[in-house]
Amino acid sequence: MKQHIKVIIPAYNEADSIAKVINDIPSIVNEIIVVSNNSTDNTEVNATKAGATVLQEPRKGYGYACLKGMKYIANQKIKPEIIVFLDGDYSDFPEQLIELITPIIEENIDFVLGARVKEKREKGSMTPQQIFGNWLATYLMKILFKSSFKDLGPFRAIKYDKLIALKMEDKTYGWTIEMQLKALKQKFSYLEIPVKYRNRIGTSKVSGTLKGTILAGIKILNWIFKYSFK
């Protein structure tokens, strides 16, 4: 049976990259939803020209943008079977979406994460603080939750009904870790697929600044320790 698939792309000032991301998404996808997170450049214009549905979320925060996309889908008559989350900076390879959704379709896996493994990462595509933060977070998840996750990457696919069951709430930097921790707690079946990763177009709004890195790190650790006591 053909699956109904939607992609949600949070985007903040990604005018130079957003069309490339959209154009590389496989045609199997039914709808591409770009959520402009208060962008001040031509992100919205370029996304519209490339064929995406464009939503506006004035409240800054990765989670706010993702939740906006989910609310839009919830209000539609026809619900998808699979939701894919993808960043708008062209650091991921959108064509690998097929590799992420295949285990869901063929093996009935609930949640598939694109893992940015060292062997497939372009040099410099992840900052030292990102690499260390990923290692620390996934190590703590292994110790506290017996998790086998190796990454917190944003490129991920999940069954729509499972996503709704997670009752996602984080508004900012903790969105990805929240999803993984809740999936573990609810005993979802999950899988990591190694994905390629390249240097993004433009400057990162999180890992590209000291403030963003610190805030993201604090939020991630907060989620881990919050769930370790539940």
Predicted region positions:
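Acceptor/aglycone-binding surface of glycosyltransferases and processive sugar-polymer synthases
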Residues: 58-60, 64-71, 94-173, 200-211, ...
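Short, well-formed alpha-helical segments that are part of the catalytic scaffolds
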Residues: 12-28
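Short loop->beta transition adjacent to catalytic acidic/histidine clusters or analogous donor-positioning motifs
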Residues: 2-5, 26-34, 81
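Short beta-strand-to-loop acidic/aromatic patch adjacent to the donor-nucleotide binding site
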Residues: 79-91
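Hydrophobic helical membrane-anchoring modules
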Residues: 1-2, 16, 146, 168-230
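Donor nucleotide-sugar binding loop of glycosyltransferases
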Residues: 14-17, 39, 93
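A conserved acidic beta->alpha catalytic loop
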Residues: 36-45
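Conserved donor nucleotide-binding strand/loop of the catalytic core
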Residues: 44-76
